[in-house]
Each structure stands twice: as C-alpha cells, then as structure tokens.
C-alpha cells in the first residue's frame, strides 16, 4: 500500500478492470485543510497514483456542510 500524508483517504469508486479508483481524501497544506475527490490509476510498479483529474476545495464547516446537503439532495432524488 502506498504511503501518503493524507489525514483521511477512502476509495469511493473502483473499476478494477480499468485500474481506476476515485478517492475522497483530506490533507493539510500550508496550515489549511483541503478535501479532494481525485481519480487514481494503477501504475505497474508503484500501486495506485493520483491523476490531475479531480477537484480540491478548502475544507471548512461551510464547504463540508454544502457538500453533505448536495449529497442528501441527490440521494433523495434517487428514491
């Protein structure tokens, strides 16, 4: 398993046939917490590595609350 400096790291989608993962991660940079949703690819020699595809937002109570509300809305629409 690869070593990261992530405070939180969770696979939220995986396609083993294509060697792809999407991960939700949280890390700190210059004393600011960031939340990432990023695509990873399977390297032949180093395990899964991040791509440039994804999004990163400052992790604040407000941004996490908005993300949570959006996910709740999506879930309620699928029922």
Question: What is each PLM-predicted segment?
Answer:
Residues 1-20:
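Negatively charged, low-complexity tracts enriched in Asp/Glu with abundant Ser/Thr
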Residues 5-6, 23, 31, 61, ...:
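Low-complexity, intrinsically disordered regions enriched in charged/polar residues
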Residues 7, 11-12, 37, 57, ...:
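Weak global preference for isoleucine
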Residues 13-14, 26-31, 59:
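Generic structural "secondary-structure junction" signal
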Residues 22-53:
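A short, structured beta-strand/loop element
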Residues 53-79:
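Mixed-charge, Lys/Arg-enriched low-complexity segments
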């Amino acid at each position: 398993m690869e070593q990261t400096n992530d405070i939180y790291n969770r696979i939220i989608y995986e396609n083993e046939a294509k060697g792809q993962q999407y991960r939700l991660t949280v890390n700190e940079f210059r004393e600011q917490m960031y939340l990432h949703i990023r695509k990873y690819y399977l390297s032949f020699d180093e395990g899964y590595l991040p791509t440039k595809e994804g999004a990163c937002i400052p992790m604040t109570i407000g941004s996490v609350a908005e993300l949570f509300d959006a996910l709740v809305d999506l879930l309620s629409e699928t029922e």
